[in-house]
UniProtKB/Swiss-Prot annotation:
It comes from Anaeromyxobacter dehalogenans (strain 2CP-1 / ATCC BAA-258). Keywords: Cytoplasm, DNA-binding. This is Nucleoid-associated protein A2cp1_3777. Its main location: cytoplasm. InterPro entries: YbaB-like_sf, YbaB/EbfC. Binds to DNA and alters its conformation. May be involved in regulation of gene expression, nucleoid organization and DNA protection. Belongs to the YbaB/EbfC family. The keyword Cytoplasm applies. It is found in: Cytoplasm, Nucleoid. The lineage of its organism: Bacteria, Pseudomonadati, Myxococcota, Myxococcia, Myxococcales. GO terms for molecular function: DNA binding. One of its GO terms (cellular component) is cytosol. Homodimer.
Length: 103
């Protein structure tokens, strides 16, 4: 085996992964709960970029409902963001699964 070749391949993979990680912020996913009463937009880094709450979801006598709706929407968005990030990183690594990367 040519060690120099392996080193070049490792450098290419490292660069591809770094580029893919930078692009995670450009990935956009959305999720909702309560039939659209709560909507969450998130990027591939699992950072919330927008959260909207329909006034119909705000009932001072039922705070728990709003909390549940927000929790459900955020969890759904996180799942979508992780899936999108995993797909992006998989493309960058040629399908090689690397533990601890994107997700």
């Amino acid at each position: 085996m040519d060690i120099q070749y392996l080193m070049r391949q490792a450098k290419k993979l490292e660069k591809a992964m770094a580029d893919a990680k930078e692009k995670l912020a450009e990935i956009a996913v959305e999720a909702e709960s309560g039939g659209g009463l709560v909507k969450v937009a998130m990027n591939g880094k699992c950072e919330i970029t927008r959260l909207t709450v329909d006034p119909k979801a705000v009932d001072p006598n039922d705070k728990a409902l709003l909390e549940d709706l927000v929790t459900a929407a955020v969890n759904a968005a996180v799942e979508k963001a992780r899936t999108a990030a995993d797909e992006s990183m998989s493309k960058a690594t040629g399908g090689i699964k690397i533990p601890g990367i994107a997700g």
